[in-house]
């Protein structure tokens, strides 16, 4: 069965001959940016067809009517040519053309030569490479409740012409209000100190830029903030004078603290050095005391078996050793009965008086003969040592003897007056 068709729809064989069908195919092959050129060709084609159909009417009447008709035709033709020629426009390299059709956005025209139907489309060129500026100024209250005079310039650039024109009614005014809001928000959280130290322009520039971007983001304005510059940023004169004394006192305080810190570090380092020195001396004294004690113990252990075998001889020897230490540092001079200046130790007296008894006791006991020789030899050495010391005392004065005594390390003794 044949398919039912509408009365005004051409058949399949006649579709290729239908001019309106061809026109629809042409429209489908062009993109949105090339519609304006298609409108131009369609209008020219319609004008030519109109003149062909009306040719008989214009040229078949009488002379006066024919002249009038030709004049009207010429005017209409000239007007159409003028309208067609006026539709050409050129977009600069740094611009984009926002094309609207009866007030509605149609497309963006790229840089170059274009054509638009007059009275149907409108083109608004938008510069997207030039950096624009907005100035704002005012007196703003800080966090510490002080007023600050601010004069600031914000540089921005348009990145989306469509959003810039159609997102908000007045993008410049909206951006100005956003800048004021961001500036007041940052300054209201800042203390007066950073303004007095001229540090606000360095610290708050990035914060203000971020706040402006956050404010304008929901509006989709198609704007990017490039830079922020503070032309003037100062405190009122009355506020500045009131804070000069305060900041001078703060600087004096910091200087005093630094000096105190330096002095404290010096004292700590000196105390640390002294403590370390005392510890080293204490360790050396401890070691010396231990070694002396070990020497005494060793000496005692060496004498102990001799003392057990011969208590009397050992007692006399120990007594001699003790008296040697005592009288080797005495300043008393002992002479003989003739008052000759002959120095000798008290040990000599004891030895002369007891020499015979000692020899007899040693000869009676062969067991202790070797021990006696050892004791006698050591005793003789001690006698020679004492005599040499006494001779040194006689040759030098008391002060030199005190100096010599100060170098002795075996024991500590305080001299008598």
Swiss-Prot record:
Cellular-component GO terms for this entry: membrane
Renumbered residue ranges of the record's region Disordered: 1-24
Cited SUPFAM superfamilies: Band 7/SPFH domain
Keyword field contains Transmembrane helix: yes
Ranges of biased composition (kind: Basic and acidic residues): 12-24
Keyword flag Membrane: yes
CDD domains associated with the record: SPFH_HflK
Entry's transmembrane regions: 71-91
InterPro entries in alphabetical order: Band7/mec-2_domain, Band_7, Band_7/SPFH_dom_sf, HflK
Subcellular location as annotated: Membrane
SMART domains linked to this entry: PHB
UniProt function note: HflC and HflK could encode or regulate a protease.
Complex and partners: HflC and HflK may interact to form a multimeric complex.
Protein family membership: Belongs to the band 7/mec-2 family. HflK subfamily.
Protein name as annotated: Protein HflK
């Amino acid at each position: 069965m044949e398919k039912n068709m509408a009365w005004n729809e051409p058949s399949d064989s006649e579709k290729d001959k239908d001019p309106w069908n061809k026109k629809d195919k042409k429209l489908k092959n062009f993109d949105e940016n090339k519609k304006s050129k298609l409108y131009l060709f369609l209008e020219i084609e319609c004008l030519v067809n109109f003149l062909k159909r009306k040719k008989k009417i214009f040229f078949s009447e009488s002379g006066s009517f024919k002249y009038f008709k030709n004049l009207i035709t010429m005017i209409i033709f000239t007007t159409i040519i003028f309208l067609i020629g006026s539709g050409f426009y050129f977009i600069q390299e740094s611009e984009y053309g926002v094309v609207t059709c009866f007030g509605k956005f149609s497309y963006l025209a790229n840089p170059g030569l274009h054509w638009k139907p007059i009275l149907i489309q409108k083109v608004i060129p938008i510069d997207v490479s030039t950096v624009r500026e907005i100035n704002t100024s005012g007196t703003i209250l800080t966090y510490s409740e002080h007023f600050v005079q601010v004069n600031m310039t914000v540089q921005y650039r348009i990145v989306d012409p469509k959003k810039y024109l159609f997102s908000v009614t007045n993008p410049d005014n909206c951006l100005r209000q956003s800048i004021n809001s961001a500036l007041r928000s940052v300054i209201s959280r800042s203390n007066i100190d950073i303004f007095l130290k001229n540090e606000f322009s360095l610290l708050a520039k990035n914060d203000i830029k971020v706040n402006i971007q956050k404010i304008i983001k929901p509006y989709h304005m198609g704007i990017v903030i490039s830079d922020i510059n503070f032309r003037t940023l100062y405190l009122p004169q009355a506020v500045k004078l009131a804070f000069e004394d305060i900041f001078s006192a703060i600087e004096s305080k910091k200087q005093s603290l630094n000096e105190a810190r330096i002095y404290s570090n010096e004292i700590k380092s000196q105390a640390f050095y002294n403590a370390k020195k005392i510890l080293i001396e204490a360790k050396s004294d401890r070691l010396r005391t231990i070694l002396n004690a070990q020497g005494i113990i060793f000496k005692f252990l060496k004498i102990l078996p001799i003392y057990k075998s011969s208590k009397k001889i050992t007692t006399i020897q120990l007594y001699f050793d003790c008296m040697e230490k005592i009288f080797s540092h005495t300043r008393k001079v002992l002479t003989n009965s003739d008052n000759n200046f002959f120095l000798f130790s008290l040990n000599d007296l004891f030895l002369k008086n007891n020499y015979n008894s000692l020899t007899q006791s040693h000869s009676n006991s062969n067991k202790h003969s070797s021990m006696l020789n050892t004791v006698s030899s050591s005793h003789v050495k001690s006698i020679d040592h004492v005599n040499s010391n006494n001779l040194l005392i006689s040759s030098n004065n008391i002060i030199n003897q005190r100096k010599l005594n100060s170098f002795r390390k075996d024991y500590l003794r305080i001299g008598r007056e």
